[in-house]
Design a protein with these regions (language model features):
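Short, well-ordered beta-strand segments in beta-rich or mixed alpha/beta enzyme
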Residues: 10-16, 46-77
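Non-catalytic surface loops within mature trypsin-like serine protease
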Residues: 20, 66, 102-105
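Membrane-topology and secretion signals of cell-surface/extracellular proteins
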Residues: 7-8, 18, 26-27, 38, ...
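Glycine-rich beta-strand-turn "strand-cap" elements at beta-sheet edges
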Residues: 1-10, 43-59, 82-113
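Intrinsically disordered, low-complexity acidic/polar segments
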Residues: 23-25, 69-71, 107-109
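Short linear sequence elements within intrinsically disordered, low-complexity coil regions
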Residues: 31-35, 63, 68-69, 78, ...
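Short amphipathic alpha-helical segments
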Residues: 18-47, 78-86
Length: 113
């Protein structure tokens, strides 16, 4: 799928886990400190949450027109993670990498809020 200004070509996926007891607090912090700035740079952003028995996993998918656009956001290496100031306080472990995928097909309503 060729990249165009209206269609993203790349998805960047970040995952992080916190304890269930701190999940709501982390989500509020992460939305303010992580998601809001990302919305200003990426073509689109999705934030997902899965509550498990003892922990909660957060996943953020950001959509980009190209690897180059993502590289401008990260300052060079598109796989580089920008840990937030309080991530060490909340997360069970700091993620070591992000996943970068080429977007091939997107159909229907993929969600927005």
């Amino acid at each position: 799928m060729p990249a165009s200004p209206s269609r993203p070509a790349i998805a960047r996926i970040w995952r992080g886990r916190t304890t269930r007891a701190r999940a709501d607090e982390y989500e509020a912090y992460y939305n303010e400190a992580g998601i809001k700035p990302l919305i200003e740079k990426a073509m689109g952003v999705q934030s997902l949450r899965e509550d498990r028995a003892d922990e909660t996993e957060f996943m953020t998918i950001s959509y980009w027109e190209s690897i180059e656009a993502m590289s401008r956001f990260t300052g060079g290496d598109p796989t580089k993670i920008h840990h937030l100031e309080r991530d060490k306080e909340f997360l069970i472990e700091l993620p070591a990498a992000v996943q970068i995928l080429k977007l091939r097909h997107s159909h229907g309503n993929t969600g927005s809020k």
